[in-house]
Regions:
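Short, glycine/charge-rich flexible loops or terminal/linker lids adjacent to PRPP-binding catalytic cores
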Residues: 75-119
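Conserved acidic residues
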Residues: 53, 116, 146
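Short Gly/Thr/Asp-enriched flexible loops that form oxyanion-binding sites at enzyme active sites
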Residues: 64-73, 135
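Active-site-facing substrate-recognition patch
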Residues: 1-52, 110
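Generic enzyme active-site microenvironment
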Residues: 57, 120-121
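PRPP-dependent phosphoribosyltransferase catalytic core
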Residues: 2, 9, 132-168
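Acidic, divalent-metal-coordinating active-site segment for phosphoryl/phosphodiester hydrolysis
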Residues: 122-135
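Short glycine-rich phosphate-binding loop at a beta-alpha junction
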Residues: 51-59
Length: 168
């Protein structure tokens, strides 16, 4: 059962950051409140039907949410990092667009069984470029993405499959 919390009360808004025209959603107030953070994790987990074998954590704030989801719901964690931050020799890479630029993601290509069920986790859903890149990496490795999960949808893309706890 979802908790009754107005999570937007715990999200700050910083205008024109990181560039003019962008409103940065600051999750620090939510993270600073232990009860609200815990409830947000439980409510995020309740958005998906089946718990995965792995939570795929996107750099960097996705690490916070995927770790907490793993602790509450079980399952391991796999990291997707920005280019050049993983030391593994077996890496898969993809380039993608952001709402204000371009970047690259990398993921270790662990020898796992094909079709391992995963849920991709991040803090913010904006244009969908990050989630699409993460899904591409997961498929290259052989994972089956069962869900994509974010704390916040900032409302740029009207229709998408990503499950978000807070919608603007």
């Amino acid at each position: 059962m979802p908790t009754v919390v107005n999570y937007k009360d715990y999200i700050g808004a910083i205008q024109d950051f990181p560039i003019k025209g962008i409103t940065y959603r600051d999750i620090q107030p939510l993270l600073a409140n232990e009860t609200v953070f815990r409830n947000s994790i439980k409510d995020m987990g309740n958005l998906i039907d089946k718990k995965p074998e792995y939570w795929i954590a996107l750099e960097s704030r996705g690490f916070l949410f995927a770790s907490a989801l793993s602790m509450i719901y079980g399952g391991g964690i796999r990291l997707i990092r920005k280019k050049g931050k993983l030391g593994n020799s077996q890496l898969v890479r993809v380039d993608y667009g952001l709402e204000y630029g371009k970047d690259s993601f990398e993921m270790a290509n662990f020898p796992e069984k094909k079709g391992t069920k995963v849920v991709i986790v991040d803090d913010i859903y904006a244009t969908g470029g990050t989630m699409q890149a993460a899904e591409t990496l997961c498929k290259k490795v052989g994972y089956e993405v069962t869900d994509q999960l974010c704390l916040i949808d900032i409302g740029i893309v009207e229709q998408h499959e990503v499950k978000c706890l807070i919608n603007y």
